Amino acid sequence: RLLDEKYSGKIKLHMINTAGKSTVQAVRTAMCDETEILAVECNCICTHPLDEIIKVHLSHDTFCTALTYDTENKPAGIYIVKRELFESLNPEKPTDMTEDIIPEAVKSGEAVLLDGKGYYKRITTPEAFLDCQRHMLYNENMSQRLTENNFSGAAIGEPVYIGENVSVMSGSVIELSLIHI
Protein backbone atom coordinates (compact mmCIF):
# COMPACT_ATOMS: atom_id res chain seq x y z
CA ARG A 1 0.00 0.00 0.00
CA LEU A 2 2.81 2.45 0.81
CA LEU A 3 4.33 1.86 -2.60
CA ASP A 4 1.02 2.73 -4.25
CA GLU A 5 0.56 5.87 -2.12
CA LYS A 6 4.03 7.21 -2.84
CA TYR A 7 4.34 6.18 -6.47
CA SER A 8 0.70 6.02 -7.59
CA GLY A 9 1.20 2.38 -8.53
CA LYS A 10 4.01 3.24 -10.96
CA ILE A 11 7.10 1.45 -9.77
CA LYS A 12 10.07 1.11 -12.10
CA LEU A 13 11.99 -2.15 -11.97
CA HIS A 14 15.64 -1.97 -13.00
CA MET A 15 17.74 -5.09 -13.36
CA ILE A 16 21.40 -4.21 -13.41
CA ASN A 17 24.22 -6.55 -14.45
CA THR A 18 26.89 -5.82 -11.86
CA ALA A 19 29.68 -7.67 -13.69
CA GLY A 20 32.70 -5.43 -13.39
CA LYS A 21 30.80 -2.88 -11.29
CA SER A 22 30.71 -2.24 -7.59
CA THR A 23 27.33 -2.25 -5.87
CA VAL A 24 27.57 1.54 -5.57
CA GLN A 25 28.00 1.85 -9.35
CA ALA A 26 25.08 -0.54 -9.91
CA VAL A 27 22.76 1.40 -7.57
CA ARG A 28 23.79 4.69 -9.21
CA THR A 29 22.99 3.21 -12.62
CA ALA A 30 19.59 2.00 -11.43
CA MET A 31 18.72 5.41 -9.96
CA CYS A 32 18.58 7.08 -13.39
CA ASP A 33 16.65 10.28 -12.71
CA GLU A 34 15.19 9.17 -9.37
CA THR A 35 16.04 10.94 -6.11
CA GLU A 36 15.78 7.75 -4.05
CA ILE A 37 15.62 4.05 -4.76
CA LEU A 38 14.74 0.80 -3.00
CA ALA A 39 17.54 -1.65 -3.81
CA VAL A 40 17.16 -5.39 -3.26
CA GLU A 41 20.17 -7.48 -4.14
CA CYS A 42 19.16 -10.47 -6.23
CA ASN A 43 21.23 -13.01 -4.32
CA CYS A 44 19.02 -13.11 -1.23
CA ILE A 45 15.64 -14.40 -0.16
CA CYS A 46 13.82 -12.36 2.45
CA THR A 47 10.31 -12.55 3.88
CA HIS A 48 10.46 -9.20 5.69
CA PRO A 49 7.63 -6.94 4.42
CA LEU A 50 9.19 -4.30 2.17
CA ASP A 51 6.47 -1.78 3.01
CA GLU A 52 7.88 -1.64 6.55
CA ILE A 53 11.32 -0.50 5.38
CA ILE A 54 9.62 2.12 3.20
CA LYS A 55 7.55 3.34 6.15
CA VAL A 56 10.66 3.63 8.37
CA HIS A 57 12.57 5.42 5.62
CA LEU A 58 9.78 7.95 5.06
CA SER A 59 9.59 8.69 8.80
CA HIS A 60 13.32 9.59 9.10
CA ASP A 61 15.26 12.35 7.38
CA THR A 62 18.34 10.31 6.51
CA PHE A 63 20.14 9.36 3.31
CA CYS A 64 19.74 5.63 3.87
CA THR A 65 17.55 3.00 5.54
CA ALA A 66 18.91 -0.54 5.58
CA LEU A 67 17.50 -3.88 6.67
CA THR A 68 19.81 -5.91 8.93
CA TYR A 69 19.76 -9.57 9.91
CA ASP A 70 23.21 -10.58 11.13
CA THR A 71 24.18 -10.47 14.78
CA GLU A 72 27.00 -8.18 13.67
CA ASN A 73 24.28 -5.74 12.54
CA LYS A 74 25.50 -5.73 8.94
CA PRO A 75 23.15 -4.58 6.18
CA ALA A 76 21.36 -7.42 4.39
CA GLY A 77 21.51 -6.09 0.83
CA ILE A 78 18.06 -4.49 1.08
CA TYR A 79 18.12 -0.73 1.47
CA ILE A 80 16.62 2.59 0.42
CA VAL A 81 19.08 5.31 -0.51
CA LYS A 82 18.80 8.93 -1.56
CA ARG A 83 20.95 10.42 -4.29
CA GLU A 84 22.68 12.67 -1.73
CA LEU A 85 24.40 9.63 -0.26
CA PHE A 86 26.58 9.42 -3.38
CA GLU A 87 27.45 13.12 -3.83
CA SER A 88 30.82 12.98 -2.04
CA LEU A 89 31.91 9.65 -3.53
CA ASN A 90 34.32 9.10 -6.38
CA PRO A 91 32.16 7.48 -9.11
CA GLU A 92 35.12 5.52 -10.50
CA LYS A 93 36.23 4.00 -7.19
CA PRO A 94 34.89 0.47 -6.63
CA THR A 95 32.89 0.59 -3.42
CA ASP A 96 30.48 -1.79 -1.77
CA MET A 97 27.17 -0.57 -0.36
CA THR A 98 26.91 -3.05 2.52
CA GLU A 99 30.60 -3.13 3.45
CA ASP A 100 31.63 0.52 2.95
CA ILE A 101 28.90 3.07 2.28
CA ILE A 102 26.10 2.06 4.66
CA PRO A 103 28.42 1.55 7.68
CA GLU A 104 29.91 5.02 7.06
CA ALA A 105 26.42 6.51 6.79
CA VAL A 106 25.51 4.87 10.12
CA LYS A 107 28.63 6.35 11.78
CA SER A 108 27.78 9.83 10.50
CA GLY A 109 24.13 9.57 11.56
CA GLU A 110 22.83 9.54 7.98
CA ALA A 111 21.38 6.01 8.07
CA VAL A 112 18.73 4.09 9.96
CA LEU A 113 19.07 0.34 10.49
CA LEU A 114 15.95 -1.79 10.74
CA ASP A 115 16.05 -5.22 12.38
CA GLY A 116 14.80 -7.77 9.87
CA LYS A 117 11.99 -10.17 10.70
CA GLY A 118 11.22 -13.53 9.17
CA TYR A 119 13.41 -15.60 6.91
CA TYR A 120 16.59 -14.25 5.33
CA LYS A 121 19.27 -16.09 3.40
CA ARG A 122 22.08 -14.69 1.27
CA ILE A 123 22.75 -17.06 -1.62
CA THR A 124 26.29 -16.76 -2.90
CA THR A 125 27.25 -20.41 -3.46
CA PRO A 126 25.55 -23.55 -4.78
CA GLU A 127 25.67 -24.92 -1.22
CA ALA A 128 23.83 -21.85 0.13
CA PHE A 129 21.20 -22.26 -2.60
CA LEU A 130 20.61 -25.91 -1.64
CA ASP A 131 20.52 -25.01 2.06
CA CYS A 132 17.89 -22.36 1.34
CA GLN A 133 15.80 -24.82 -0.68
CA ARG A 134 15.95 -27.39 2.13
CA HIS A 135 15.00 -24.78 4.70
CA MET A 136 12.01 -23.61 2.70
CA LEU A 137 10.81 -27.17 2.08
CA TYR A 138 11.23 -28.60 5.56
CA ASN A 139 10.96 -25.69 8.02
CA GLU A 140 7.49 -25.76 9.55
CA ASN A 141 7.73 -22.05 10.44
CA MET A 142 7.79 -20.86 6.84
CA SER A 143 4.70 -18.71 6.45
CA GLN A 144 4.58 -19.10 2.67
CA ARG A 145 3.79 -22.81 2.72
CA LEU A 146 1.32 -23.95 0.11
CA THR A 147 -1.92 -25.33 1.46
CA GLU A 148 -5.14 -26.55 -0.10
CA ASN A 149 -6.57 -23.07 0.44
CA ASN A 150 -3.91 -21.27 -1.63
CA PHE A 151 -5.19 -22.35 -5.04
CA SER A 152 -8.27 -23.85 -6.57
CA GLY A 153 -8.60 -25.51 -9.95
CA ALA A 154 -4.83 -25.71 -10.39
CA ALA A 155 -3.43 -28.04 -13.04
CA ILE A 156 -0.02 -29.64 -12.57
CA GLY A 157 2.03 -29.75 -15.76
CA GLU A 158 4.09 -32.68 -16.91
CA PRO A 159 6.40 -34.37 -16.25
CA VAL A 160 5.66 -34.97 -12.57
CA TYR A 161 7.29 -37.52 -10.32
CA ILE A 162 5.31 -38.44 -7.22
CA GLY A 163 7.77 -39.87 -4.72
CA GLU A 164 7.64 -41.45 -1.28
CA ASN A 165 5.55 -39.84 1.46
CA VAL A 166 3.34 -37.95 -1.02
CA SER A 167 -0.40 -38.16 -0.44
CA VAL A 168 -2.70 -38.25 -3.45
CA MET A 169 -6.11 -37.21 -2.17
CA SER A 170 -9.49 -38.45 -3.31
CA GLY A 171 -10.80 -36.55 -6.29
CA SER A 172 -7.35 -36.38 -7.91
CA VAL A 173 -7.17 -37.51 -11.52
CA ILE A 174 -3.99 -39.19 -12.71
CA GLU A 175 -3.86 -40.01 -16.41
CA LEU A 176 -1.38 -41.65 -18.77
CA SER A 177 0.95 -42.60 -15.92
CA LEU A 178 3.41 -45.31 -15.00
CA ILE A 179 2.99 -46.70 -11.52
CA HIS A 180 6.08 -48.25 -9.91
CA ILE A 181 5.48 -50.39 -6.85
Name these PLM-found stretches.
Residues 64-68, 155:
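Short, hydrophobic beta-strand segments that form beta-sheet elements in well-ordered domains
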Residues 180-181:
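Conserved small/polar residues in nucleotide/adenosyl-binding loops
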Residues 34, 61-62:
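Short, high-confidence coil segments that cap the C-terminus of an alpha-helix
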Residues 12-14, 63, 110-112:
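Conserved beta-strand segments of alpha/beta enzyme cores
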Residues 1-52:
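Conserved N-terminal catalytic core of the sugar/cofactor nucleotidyltransferase
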Residues 36-38, 45-46, 50-58, 68-143:
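Catalytic-core segments of class I nucleotidyltransferases/pyrophosphorylases
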Residues 137-159:
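Long, charged amphipathic helices and adjacent flexible linkers at domain junctions
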Residues 152, 157-158, 163-164, 169-170, ...:
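Left-handed beta-helix
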